[in-house]
Amino acid sequence: MNKPRGYLCSTTDDRGRKCVTDLLEGVSARVYPVGRLDLVSEGILLLTDDGELKNRLTHPRHTIGKIYRVKVDGKVSDEQMEILTSELVIDGYKILPVSLSVSSEDESGTVLKMTLFEGRNRQIRKMCEAANLTVKRLSRISIGNLKLDGLPVGKWRYLEQHEVDYLYKATKEKNEHV
């Protein structure tokens, strides 16, 4: 799914807010979001009815990279880049260092490309806050080698079998044969 801003990564909400499953017209299976993007974030989101795959993709021991495009206010200094790529403690947890590059920079701000290998709650926003950066827009653009590839915002598609196989292989245990 290409999750739009303004939707919760949940199946229901007791406060009546829109949920990503509201966008799944014609899907009869009970599916659940894999991981999360906060209410004001957008981008690629996997939903599944496969509990084993969901557990593999969300368990911390499986480090499948997720790439984000992060638009921040202003120019990003070398010092701020160093903070973002250092070992930070967020909410009492040491987080894995991220891969980071500047995609573009202009008068409206800087676009960063960040690769994360774990997904703590609001991790990118908290990392940027630690570096004194204000996030203007946050989009997840890939999960491993899965990309949106032109999928319109608010739309979804079924994964191809080779994509499901890739996710299982990318998250397999060392002693497990797929």
What are these regions (language model features)?
Residues 1-178:
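Basic, flexible Lys/Arg- and Gly-enriched helix-loop patches that mediate nucleic-acid binding at interfaces
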